[in-house]
């Protein structure tokens, strides 16, 4: 079988499993939209694996990576609860902030994001490099750990 046919089958199965092109979360009923080179579903565990040129949009937020795993609360629930990503992480609010790093963890219900490993957070012309950042998406508060070689431009 060719690669595009297998990719089509994986996406079709995902759509059947999660009942639509987006996955809704219980909090504010935001829709997770995604694209990737490949997708694999483990229905028995409620886990979706995406790889290659992965892009997820959740409300105003964008996550790009090489590998991404989305977990539901249970096999009977289409709502994604946890997102974990690795390989060339990029996170943005589509306004004024973006961050790059090695690994990302997002709790969709709590609207919390953690990025770690060679993190580069930028806002405007300012760049803060750190080992880890934690972002509260509700209050838009960012906590930094292990800051190094950073600058803030007014």
Identify what each model region corresponds to.
Residues 1-154:
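Mature-chain termini and adjacent capping regions
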């Amino acid at each position: 079988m060719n690669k595009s046919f297998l990719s089509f089958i994986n996406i079709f199965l995902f759509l059947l499993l999660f009942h639509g092109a987006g996955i809704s979360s219980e909090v504010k009923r935001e829709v997770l939209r995604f694209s990737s080179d490949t997708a694999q579903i483990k229905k028995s565990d409620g886990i979706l694996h995406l790889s290659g040129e992965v892009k997820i949009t959740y409300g105003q937020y964008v996550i790009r990576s090489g590998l991404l795993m989305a977990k539901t609360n249970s096999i009977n629930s289409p709502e994604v609860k946890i997102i974990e990503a690795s390989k060339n992480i990029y996170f943005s609010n589509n306004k004024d902030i973006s961050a790059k790093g090695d690994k990302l963890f997002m709790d969709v219900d709590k609207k919390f994001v953690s990025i770690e490993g060679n993190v580069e957070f930028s806002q405007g012309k300012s760049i803060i490099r750190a080992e880890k950042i934690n972002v509260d998406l509700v209050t838009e508060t960012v906590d930094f750990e292990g800051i190094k070689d950073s600058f803030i431009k007014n």
